[in-house]
């Protein structure tokens, strides 16, 4: 393997595997490289979202390079994922959002049974977007504009007079925030939060956009949808009038380019079962 490929490979592994377990950088392409994971079984756990799996796959590849015997990953929803880690049914994940999953983390045992390690993906945004064409034509800039019946009707896809918004999967952390926002911003009379299989709903949303129809949806970035519906070209963020979170802890950063998106700017973290973390860190 040439030096350039070696460096790229090391960078890839460092980006997730080292952060996941918070172990020293022991990478090299030589056959004599140290293998801190030799003889250690490790069981990953992922959410049941294909679009999120790539981080786990990178982590597993890196851990195998470090000598760990990586077991078949388990899959479940986010609350159950953290409970499984807490109980020792799995050893690590790279899919926990610092703010969004805070209540799931605490309910699973918090720092008593779990350990947060590396920042896998910082600067994650969430918020509400609409198509730029409609935003420009009707001067829509804020989620509060949807309180106006004549504006809400622009996004009505089933004839009930309400704006149809693509929301979150039931059970996701964002579901709680979106439902809270519906009440906090007075949107319940004019906006319908359509919850279900998010990516199936987004396929319909994208199809509507391609037909030239107005669209309204919750999303987060980075993910693949932002490369299909491009910010500033196809769609724009809507601001919120104030930060209003279910926890009441509103003194957090919810700004993106001077616009309040209403959701904390988040960081995806690696989380380990505490007993497992202590075992692999012993000299």
Model regions and ranges:
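Bacterial N-terminal signal peptides
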Residues: 14-27
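Short, well-ordered beta-strand elements
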Residues: 37-51, 68-74, 162-166
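Short helix-initiation/N-cap motifs at beta->coil->alpha
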Residues: 49-50, 68-83, 192-204
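Short, polar/charged alpha-helical segment
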Residues: 50-69, 180-183
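Pocket-flanking alpha-helical
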Residues: 56, 73-112, 204-208, 224-230
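Ligand-binding pocket segment of bilobal, Venus flytrap-like solute-binding proteins
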Residues: 90-94, 169-244
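C-terminal lobe and pocket-closing loops
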Residues: 226-283
């Amino acid at each position: 393997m040439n030096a350039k490929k070696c460096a790229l490979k090391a960078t890839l592994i460092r980006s997730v595997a080292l952060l996941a377990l918070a172990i020293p950088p022991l990478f090299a392409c030589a056959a004599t490289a140290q293998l801190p994971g030799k003889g250690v079984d490790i069981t990953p756990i992922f959410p049941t979202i294909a679009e999120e799996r790539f981080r786990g796959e990178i982590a597993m590849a890196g851990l195998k390079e470090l000598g760990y015997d990586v077991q078949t990953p388990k899959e479940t929803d986010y609350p159950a994922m953290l409970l499984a880690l807490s109980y020792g049914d799995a050893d690590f994940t790279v899919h926990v959002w610092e703010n969004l999953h805070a209540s799931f983390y605490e309910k699973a045992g918090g720092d008593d049974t779990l350990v947060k390690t590396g920042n896998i993906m910082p600067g994650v945004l969430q918020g509400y977007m609409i198509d730029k064409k409609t935003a420009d034509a009707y001067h829509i800039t804020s989620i509060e504009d949807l309180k106006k019946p004549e504006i809400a009707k622009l996004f009505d896809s089933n004839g009930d007079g309400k704006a149809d918004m693509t929301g979150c999967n039931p059970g996701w952390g964002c579901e709680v925030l979106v439902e809270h926002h519906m009440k906090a911003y007075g949107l319940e009379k004019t906006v319908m939060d359509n919850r279900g299989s998010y990516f199936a709903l987004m396929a319909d949303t994208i199809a509507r956009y391609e037909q030239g129809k107005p669209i309204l949806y919750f999303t987060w970035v980075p993910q693949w949808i932002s490369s299909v519906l491009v910010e500033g070209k196809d769609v724009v963020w809507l601001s919120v009038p104030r930060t209003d979170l279910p926890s009441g802890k509103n003194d957090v950063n919810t700004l993106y380019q001077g616009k309040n998106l209403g959701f904390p700017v988040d960081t995806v973290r690696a989380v380990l079962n505490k007993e497992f973390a202590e075992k692999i860190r012993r000299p």
